[in-house]
Curated annotation (Swiss-Prot):
This is DNA mismatch repair protein MutL. Pfam families: DNA_mis_repair, HATPase_c_3, MutL_C. It comes from Buchnera aphidicola subsp. Acyrthosiphon pisum (strain APS) (Acyrthosiphon pisum symbiotic bacterium). PROSITE patterns: DNA_MISMATCH_REPAIR_1. Transmembrane segments: none annotated. Belongs to the DNA mismatch repair MutL/HexB family.
Amino acid sequence: MPIRILPSDLSSQISAGEIIERPASVVKEIIENSIDAGSKNINIIVENSGFQSIILKDDGCGIDKKDLLLAVCHHATSKINSLSDLDKLTTFGFRGEALASIRAVSRLTLISCTRFNDVAAKIYLEGFCSKNIILQPIAHPEGTTIIVDNLFYNIPVRLKFLKNKKLEFSKICEVVKKIALSHFYINFSLKHNNKLITQYNSINNRKNKINRLKDIFDTLDTSEFLEIKEKKYRMVLFGWISHPYNFKKIKNIQYCYVNNRYLYNNIFVNAVRAAYSKIEQKKNISFVLYLTIESFNIDINIHPTKNEIKFHNPDVVYTFIYEAVFSYLKKIKEKYYFNFSCKKQTQLNKEKEFYFYDSDPTFLTLISSIFLKKKQICKNIKNKIKHNNFISKSTPLEKYESSIGRLLIIIHKYYGLIYHDNNFLLLSFPVAKGIVRKQKLKNNIQKENIIEYFLSNIKINLTSQEYLILFNKKEILSKFGFHLIFKKKYVILSSIPAFLKKCNFHIIISNFFAFLFLKKQVFISDIVDWFYINVFIELKNWTYIRGIEVLLEIEYYCPLLLINPPSKLLQKININAALCILKI
């Protein structure tokens, strides 16, 4: 549809377009225009947080040269002809004010070419004071380039309120992130001051859409999210929700989209929270959800930024979202019920189903509360340093040398370079920490000093053989903090060792019990070794301070280990061999 100026009676009924408040407003408007043009590649280049320059290049259908001058006028659009067209709108823009608003506060250059044009056309405008605007021919591939220079050059008062350039650039990044989250098939790139900041590659396979979340939230553990898809009431809900029984701290992420348009809607958020409250009381609920609904069932013409919409049937939408999320949470709940059946040895490493029962069978609850048994509190490393005087107060931390040696630097996140007696050694921190925790567990068992975490009673369905195995091992399990109550046909688990509280312990316990079912006879050392392999060795980014702490702990808990350290813990670096190679 060609660009045309809307008649005054129609333009007066459309809500006012967004005022350009900051550089992020410009980026949002021009990206949405590119998406409406069918672009597959959108590149944004920003200088000085957008105040000096914002450049967007796309490979969309372009603007015909005869429409280029109209494109920068108020109420000029190709999206609608009448008010009724809003009911079947599928594009972002429709008011025809984006480029006009940007033009009013900047020096704007617009270059575009369609597949029907032999040559591209270019126009340059400075605010609304530009006169005798001339179309200039220029070489340009199919698509559009928009250059916004000197934003707010003619409104210096606005610049006084936008002094924090880091904040303004972060808002630009957030705009790109929100749009990229709902347009998987588009390549997005963002450069700032000639430096590539983000690059989101297109994803055309639905199964790989979760990769866009990984790209955008680089520290996010996507394994803690569940994919959902539900279709009902002529609506489709798709996306990801955080695992209801995940005990790791994850970033609080809440993104709602309706017909691929980002918005924050109370109906959305309240429906999701209500669904979670029926399963598990969680303060931090994360989700990225996409609702597809027929255009005539929503009104997008109620807010200048289009970040709010009106549902014509809000109760139906709320019910649909609530039922969709709750049904998936309920399935996950049932999946993690305890159901131990160990008939084959090959099932040892398979996840077992967990069955959790409340006193009311109609409302099953997974661990509704976990609290620490106020029995004993282990001393942390700071107390060890304080009371055992491992380090003199006058000794600088970077010069502290343990019996292993002096820690120089951290290498590849997990290893420490240590200098000792003119030798360089490489220490594995994950292995070292695992050994320390293993030794501490042995010490606590010997002293009957295991700290327990109490759970709301968890009912475990067992076969007669499994029941007998656990019954014969109940004493050794109690030493580790597993308190089991044996009923006629099932077992109730009421506590676990405290060191499991930060793990996904429902999976750990499943695998641990499966390990027990395959062992005719189990000793304390066997269980300690199992936890060492499956729980204690953790790959985390190590810092210099944490490295010093683990050296102190090895000295304190495992002094004999230093006489003949295992090869997986400590490796000597052959400096002499390297020097021989380097000699001229």
